[in-house]
């Protein structure tokens, strides 16, 4: 791991299944620098300007601009092709090399399949073996790939958060990497529990890769404040829904 990257460590106690190995969560803060930082600020300012022109009371417009910023945090070329660098991708590859060198196997989750495709290409270039699963994977092929990984075929398993987050057993891995924060932390917990479940014999470590000083950090702050965050953000009708004003604060 690159020296100097800040880590936030939290140890979790399992209340229901005491016989499970320990699960440790680590938030790895990835700084955006140079052109990558400038590009983020340009996207943020443009989003605010767009919303100031008439969209800041419109939940759908706000969420669309937030989505654009969140995609940029994952990999800038997804939003601005002229920004060639991608600090999060490089941090991920460094982490995967370290884990491979220590003979660990890894589950890698992202909600963005186009980002997963970029990760897949880099993984292939690095010579790492892997399985892949997203919402387009047919059920039979999904079962085959899960079984293959459990048999030892693949250093890592790349998965979309929604397609791979529930209903499968991947205890052959003892590391989990969450590449981008989802609104609802329970969804991330479900993804991590693909490895941390009955049948797991080793301690499990979960890494969250977060772009420093960006909307991703704001989402993590909301994780701590609201347990029903997905409903609050996406349901514009309930009394608990986040107001447009609250959503606008995520751009700060």
Question: Where are the model-predicted features located?
Answer:
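Helix-centric, low-specificity signal for extended rod-like, repetitive segments
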Residues: 6, 61-64, 135-138, 187, ...
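Conserved P-loop NTPase motor "coupling/switch" region that bridges the ATPase
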Residues: 1-15
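Short amphipathic alpha-helical/adjacent loop interface patches that line ligand
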Residues: 1-2, 44, 66, 116, ...
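Conserved Helicase C-terminal RecA-like lobe
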Residues: 16-42, 52-168, 238-239, 244-252
């Amino acid at each position: 791991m690159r020296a100097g990257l800040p880590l936030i460590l939290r140890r979790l106690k399992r209340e229901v299944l005491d016989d499970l190995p320990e699960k440790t969560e680590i938030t790895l803060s990835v700084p955006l620098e140079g052109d990558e930082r400038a590009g983020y600020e340009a996207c943020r300012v443009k989003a605010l300007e767009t919303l100031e022109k008439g969209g800041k009371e419109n939940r759908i417009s706000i969420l669309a601009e937030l989505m654009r910023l969140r995609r940029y945090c994952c990999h800038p070329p997804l939003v601005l092709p002229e920004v060639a660098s991608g600090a999060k991708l490089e941090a991920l590859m460094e982490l995967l090399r370290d884990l491979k060198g220590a003979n660990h196997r890894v589950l890698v989750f992202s909600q963005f399949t186009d980002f997963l495709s970029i990760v897949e290409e880099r993984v292939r270039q690095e010579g790492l073996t892997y399985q892949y699963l997203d919402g387009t994977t047919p059920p039979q092929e999904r079962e085959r790939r899960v079984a293959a990984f459990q048999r030892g075929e693949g250093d890592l398993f790349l998965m979309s958060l929604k397609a791979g987050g529930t209903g499968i057993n991947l205890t052959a891995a003892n590391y989990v990497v969450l590449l981008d924060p989802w609104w609802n932390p329970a969804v991330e917990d479900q993804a991590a529990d693909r490895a941390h479940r009955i049948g797991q014999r080793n301690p499990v470590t979960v890494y969250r890769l977060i772009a420093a000083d960006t909307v991703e950090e704001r989402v993590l702050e909301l994780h701590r404040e609201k347990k029903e965050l997905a409903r609050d953000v996406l349901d514009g009708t309930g009394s608990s829904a986040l107001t447009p004003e609250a959503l606008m604060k995520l751009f700060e």
